[in-house]
Amino acid sequence: KRVLFSMVLLMAVSFSFAQTKNVKEAKSIANDVKPNFKQAEQLIGEAMKNPETKDLADTWDVAGFIQRRINEEQMKNAFLKKPYDTLKVYNSILKMYEYYNKCDELAEIPNEKGKVKNKYRKANASSMLAERPNLINGGIQYFNLDKNKEALKFFATYVESASYPMLADKELAKNDTLLPQIAYYATLAADRVGDKDAIIKYAPSALSDKDGGKFAMQLMADAYKAKGDTAAWIKSLEEGILKFPGNDYFFANLV
């Protein structure tokens, strides 16, 4: 039994080492002069699911790095006037946001001594901020293609990223003048796919948008009504009357 236990333990250690090796190899492949991104994504994809590595910040840091490299290679092709995939550029940025944010969450967990050593935040936040406008571009492209579920992901990520702890020092919720407009776009995309919860989630951030605010409030009121939340519906109509007195919709529905 002791020999069998030792063999099982040895296999577990070997498997764990293999997954850690996958993470390092995936990063190395993505960093090649001629990277094989398919192979890199396959390796890191396995590590992102494996119990031994899925809760390690480094795994998600490498996952985000691979997406950043995909974006860089596509942009290099564009600069050299070679064929490039615009949607691949945008989707790599969307995934980069997801992976770097997950990396940051894991890196903020205190170690066994109760200390937080987040070595990833500064560099990853810088990469995310540099590409944040492309979340808008990606959302607009999908919205114009009538692929509203995909558009919603981009607009929603843009809005939600304003509240990411790793970007807190930029105070995006206060300083980003485009935020209300993109929140309105998120509300429109959510309406197109019939996602009432998403409308209710993003519409409040859109109310200060000069052109779309009144429509966001209207869509939010409709969403509450559709969900059968009469109290919230009436409250949103009353708020609409106060915020947008020139819009007859709110008063007409309240009476």
Task: Give a label for each model feature.
Residues I66-A183, D197:
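Short coil/linker segments at helix-helix boundaries
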Residues A57-V62, K115, N137, A168-A173, ...:
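Alpha-solenoid helical repeat scaffolds
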